Swiss-Prot record:
Name under which the protein is recorded: Putative small ubiquitin-related modifier 8
Record InterPro entries: Rad60/SUMO-like_dom, Ubiquitin-like_dom, Ubiquitin-like_domsf
PROSITE patterns for this protein: UBIQUITIN_2
Job description of the protein: Ubiquitin-like protein which can be covalently attached to target lysines as a monomer. Does not seem to be involved in protein degradation and may function as an antagonist of ubiquitin in the degradation process.
Note: Stress conditions rapidly and substantially elevates the amount of SUMO1 and SUMO2 conjugates with a concomitant reduction in the amount of free SUMO proteins. The SUMO conjugation system plays an important function in stress protection and/or repair.
Lineage: Eukaryota, Viridiplantae, Streptophyta, Embryophyta, Tracheophyta
Statement: the UniProt record of this protein carries the keyword Transmembrane helix: no
SUPFAM superfamilies per record: Ubiquitin-like
GO cellular component, one term: nucleus
Organism: Arabidopsis thaliana
Location of this chain's protein in the cell: Nucleus; Cytoplasm
Length: 97
């Protein structure tokens, strides 16, 4: 078969992404490229037993919105999404003498 007989690679309509939390625990999802990530985020929340409202998801350091799709974010097969629990506060006073 010559190189001209080869069919061009057509990207799959699905990708596999890894969602990793701050404890380096990973959950893998196979998702459609054109479907909102809301479904995956809720599935992750259920899987780890954490309220969805307390989670933040990031790709390349940018927060992911519920209505964004993998195509909109430029997600590719085997990309990693970070999941963080919401942190309240974060401010402390230090008194120096």
């Amino acid at each position: 078969m010559s190189s001209s007989d080869k069919k061009p690679l057509i990207p799959s309509s699905h990708i596999t992404v890894k969602v990793k939390n701050q404890d380096d625990i990973c959950v893998y999802f196979r998702i459609k490229r054109d479907v909102e990530l809301r479904k995956m985020m809720h599935a992750y929340s259920d899987k780890v037993g954490v309220e969805m409202s307390t989670l933040r998801f990031l790709f390349d350091g940018n927060r992911i919105k519920l209505n964004q799709t993998p195509n909109e974010l430029g997600l590719e097969d085997e990309d990693e999404i970070e999941a963080f629990g919401e942190q309240l506060g974060g401010f402390s006073f230090f008194h120096r003498h």
